Structure formats: C-alpha cells, structure tokens
Amino acid sequence: MAEQRLPVPRLRGVSREQFMEHLYPQRKPLVLEGLDLGSCTSKWTVDYLSQVGGTKEVKIHVAAVPQMDFISKNFVYRTLPFNKLVQRAAEETHKEFFISEDEKYYLRSLGEDPRKDVADIRQQFPSLGGDITFPMFFREEQFFSSVFRISSPGLQLWTHYDVMDNFLIQVTGKKRITLFNPRDAQYLYLSGSKSEVLNIDSPDLDKYPLFPKARRYECSLEAGDVLFIPALWFHNVVSEEFGVGVNIFWKHLPSECYDTTDTYGNKDPVAASRAVQILDRALKTLAELPEEYRDFYARQMVLRIQDKAYSKNFE
C-alpha cells in the first residue's frame, strides 16, 4: 500500500478570534504565516544569540549521527555554555567536539530545577525572552511552558507525540515537519510515546510492514512561520538548516487532568495513565488462562473497547 502524503494547510493573517472559533476546534495541524513574533526574527543571528545569551550553562543532546533515537539513546547528554552551543550548532564541522568533528547538537531548554520548574524562555533567558512575542491564541491561564530549541543542520528528531497543544515558532532557519494522525497510532510501532521507525523516508518494511498505512502530513517551516500541533499528533522534525525555535505549550484539557509532577508536558493525562495500569492488571489476570481461552477473552475485550471507547467523530 502506497503511503498517503498530505500537505499541512497554510493561512496568513489569522486573528485570535478566527483561530479560536473556527480553526482550533478542528484539531488539525496548521501553519500560520505573518504573525507578530516581535524582533526575534531579525535579531537572533548567531553573533547576537552568542553575545546576548551569554555563558549560562545548558544541558544538550550530542549525537554522532543525524537521526536521533530516544529508544536506543544513540546520543549523550553534555553541558556547554550557551554561547558555545550556539556557535557549535551553527557549524558543519567542529574543531572542538565531544564525539566526532561532525557531531550534531540539540538544545531543549529546561527549567532551573527540571524536577520542579517548567521551561520558560522569559525566565531562563530573560535577555532573549523580551525579543519574542507569543501568539496568545489561547487563554492566559492555559499557558504551560515556552521551550527554547536550537538544532544543528541535518538533525532529525524522533517521531513522538505531546499531551498538550503547542505552537512551534520557527524563528530562524528551516525545518521539515512530518506529522501523523493520532488515529493512525496502530501503524507507527510505538514504544511509549515514541515511534520505533527512525527512517520515516525509507523505512524497513520487513520490520515495519504497516507503516505506509499511516497518513503522512508534511510542511516546511521557514523563519517567521508558526505550526499549530494539536495534542496527540505525532511529529518528526528535520532541521534542514541551523535553526532556532520556540515551542509554546498550553493545556487543552482542564488543569486537573494533567499530572502535577509533569514539568516537560509529556506525561499522559492522569485518567489515561490510570486506565493503562488497569489494563496491565487485566492482562496479568488473563495470563492465568490457557492460551485458547486467553485468546478468546482478549478478543472480546478488544471488541468491547472498540465499541465503548472508539470515537466516530474523528477522521
């Protein structure tokens, strides 16, 4: 079966009211052009970021290969002064390096104490945070975090989903974003919130034969573009150039639905986690049966879940 590739729609000059009343309820990805993002799109050069961002220590991912894999952890965590990170990430080859002269760098900013604090560029990088204007296309009390992201050219981030809605603001550089519909999760060979399929452009079909059935939505983000990624939509990111971006995460569900210990915004909602725990206990109970009976009752359970929990309101 040939994979289905679909373009992510692009709209220019969308107002807050248009987004919230007509676009947001559709729960589909959308590229927004022409939004007021402040002076960051003109200011954030390598020199400016290095000078103004200063020598604050940041924890980064360092990979010897372009395709980062969170499941096998084919990268290491290291610490660099922010200005050094910016300079190295902008290079193709390095005189100073941790693994190899062509290693790749990736920053996903953290709170001051990642165990307790969420990332907010205005708090962790106040000298730069004032340059960016957030598109407040949500209620202020829904705001969760603003994550600073810096990537080396060629770096590919694994396919994963987040449990909160977010805007990916591409401040400088260019990214290719590939998204997959949450309803196609069964084709993505998941391990937790991540897909095992690293090479989405040329997957191993002997190992992942169902992957081409997943609908694939694609867009190219350039400086000044903002991508709306609804919660639960899988996304894979390739930095085609050295790039700087900021993610704005906000709560789509009431606050009490989320895990209060989650500072990254990637823990499943409390009710979902509880349901999975109950399922694990049910599977353990089923294992007490002989194979023939276990298979029979497992199929009955699947049919019941499909009947009671699957929605007919989503494509």
From Swiss-Prot:
BP term (GO), one: wybutosine biosynthetic process
Any one GO molecular function term: protein homodimerization activity
InterPro entries named in the record: Cupin_8, JmjC_dom
Pfam families membership: Cupin_8
E.C. numbers: 1.14.11.42
SUPFAM superfamilies assigned: Clavaminate synthase-like
Amino-acid positions noted as binding 2-oxoglutarate in the UniProt annotation, renumbered to this chain: 106, 166, 175
CC cofactor note: Binds 1 Fe(2+) ion per subunit.
Protein name per its UniProtKB record: tRNA wybutosine-synthesizing protein 5
Organism encoding this protein: Mus musculus (Mouse)
Gene: Tyw5
